[in-house]
Amino acid sequence: MSNQSQVMRTHGKTFFWASWFLEREVSNRLYAIYAFCRRIDDLVDESNDEVELSKNFYDVINAWENNEYHHAFEEFKGIPRNYLPREEIIKEFLKGQASDLNHHQPKNINELLIYCYRVAGVVGLMVCDSMEIKDKKLKYFAIDLGIAMQLTNICRDIKEDAERGRIYLPINIIKGLTTENILRPTKQQLIDINQARDRLLNRADLYYESGYQGIEHLPKKTARSLKIAAQLYQAIGKKMIKSKKTYLDGRIYLNKLEKSLISMQIVLRRNNINATKIHNHLLHDSIRKLPDSHNKCCLLYTSPSPRDS
């Protein structure tokens, strides 16, 4: 087993499970992307302050621009440059990671979605780059899938994040509750936070359903693997709601039987090659100015806005 795949097996069990359904060449590129993201995450953890982190990230970008060695790119060795992430996408990812060092709770859903784009939506774009996908619409859907998965992560890790002094639930949704409130809530606060969690999970479903439209237009094996990963993540969110457990009851996981059933359903299902490629531009209202986002209105789509009232 390669070092890259071992990193994913250890830290990203859902993705590792789904990767078994990919062709070896494609899975190796995705392992490399995942390992790169983990290395950047380690750089954040190793930095003592914003000044040191800025220097570390400058070194990363400088090495990339000048095609020089940097240990962050160790896993990219042997992969042709045309399959690697673009510089502007790497920069957006670094911005997202840097925001975790000097964490500020998002004021509203718009700020949260920008964060989700930078730490996960751009990973969808990295995957597009690794497959040489040029279709702009497919990139819209890739962003949506990344955002959906990050929203699921946030909802699953409410307690763990609070223990680290971080809150990703927007201020205007949880009415200014603190980490202390989250870790030791009153009965009403517990209800309010669980309702906020479920509200975000329902929003994540909008992004999942959009992402699935793009998956249908990918090569069969790639589509199958990505759909398995996405549906496993989405199933975690649905299990959170259905179980009636609170965020204090511990992280929700899927067992092997649940993973197997979902995977087999997808393997046995045919791709819907006639799936629409009309993207709901309203999903990108908050990120419209960021790379590869949908920044023009699509008049053919008349779905109601997903924005909070």
Label every model-predicted segment.
Residues 51-62, 166-203, 254:
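Divalent-cation-assisted or electrostatically stabilized phosphate/pyrophosphate-binding catalytic cores
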Residues 28-46, 139-167:
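Active-site alpha-helical segments that house and flank conserved acidic catalytic motifs
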Residues 6-52:
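An N-terminal structural lobe/cap that precedes and organizes the functional/catalytic core
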Residues 43-107, 113:
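N-terminal, motif-rich segments that launch catalysis or mediate targeting to/interaction with membranes
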Residues 301-309:
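Single conserved hydrophobic/aromatic residue that forms the stacking wall/gate
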Residues 188-239:
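Glycine/small-residue-rich hydrophobic helix-like segments
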Residues 106-141:
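Helix-hairpin-helix/helix-loop-helix acidic hairpins
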Residues 260-300:
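Acidic, carboxylate-rich catalytic segments that either coordinate divalent cations
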